[in-house]
UniProtKB/Swiss-Prot annotation:
This is Glycerol-3-phosphate acyltransferase. It is a multi-pass membrane protein. It is found in: Cell inner membrane. Its EC number is 2.3.1.275. The lineage of its organism: Bacteria, Pseudomonadati, Pseudomonadota, Betaproteobacteria, Rhodocyclales. The gene is plsY. The keyword Lipid metabolism applies. Probably interacts with PlsX. Its main location: membrane. It catalyses: an acyl phosphate + sn-glycerol 3-phosphate = a 1-acyl-sn-glycero-3-phosphate + phosphate. InterPro entries: G3P_acylTferase_PlsY. The chain crosses the membrane at residues 1-21, 78-98, 112-132, 155-175. Belongs to the PlsY family.
Length: 197
């Protein structure tokens, strides 16, 4: 397969809006119209339907992982597989199916990390869980996980181009959370489990 075609396929895969799909399957409102307005698992959870939120989480993680795994299976190099993961991540954030206004990309990024290196993914997940439990803020947990990712990547993978891809994903995650950072600073950020109103 041509590398450009791989990137396009990974982007299309990443663009699949599982938050919208799962909400329709469970007869829920469009998650872009309540809570934070973000089409992601945390916002779907605000609907009160944990099954829909779980399906969203699994779907968003899976598409990131599948992009990396599929690229590796097709014989592409580790950095090319990581770039396929980046394409899937960008597909989620700038979904062609949602007029290029997708989600924050946290779950998809975790899937990409899992495809690249399980230990890097586990370190990010551990940090996310720890901060989420301590603060009850999904955004704070995501920011902390984003910061640790290129660090753990450098430790575990060395100075490789793949780590640069991880750093780029982390930077985009922080940028996508800019409104949440402002809300955290002024005390208006919603906590995990808050209602959708």
């Amino acid at each position: 397969m041509n590398f450009l075609l791989l990137l396009l396929a990974a982007y299309a895969l990443g663009s699949t809006p599982f938050a919208i799909v799962s909400s329709r399957l469970f007869g829920l409102a469009d998650p872009r119209r309540y809570g934070s307005g973000n089409p992601g698992a945390t916002n779907v959870l605000r609907s009160g339907n944990k099954a829909a939120a779980l399906l969203t989480l699994v779907g968003d993680c899976a598409k990131g992982w599948l992009a990396v795994w599929g690229a590796a299976k097709l014989g592409f190099s580790p950095v090319e597989a990581a770039l396929a993961g980046l394409a899937a991540f960008l597909g989620h954030v700038f979904s062609v199916f949602l007029r290029f206004r997708g989600g924050k990309g946290v779950a998809t990024a975790l899937g990409v990390l899992a495809g690249i290196n399980a230990w890097v993914a586990l370190s990010a997940l551990f940090v996310w869980l720890a901060v989420a439990v301590l603060t009850r803020y999904s955004s704070a947990a995501a920011l902390a996980a984003a910061v640790i990712t290129p660090i753990s990547g450098a430790v575990l993978l060395g100075a490789t181009p793949t780590v640069a891809v991880l750093a780029l994903i982390a930077g985009i995650l922080v940028w996508r959370h800019a409104p949440n950072i402002r809300k955290l600073m002024n005390g208006s950020e919603s906590k995990i489990g808050a209602s959708k109103s």
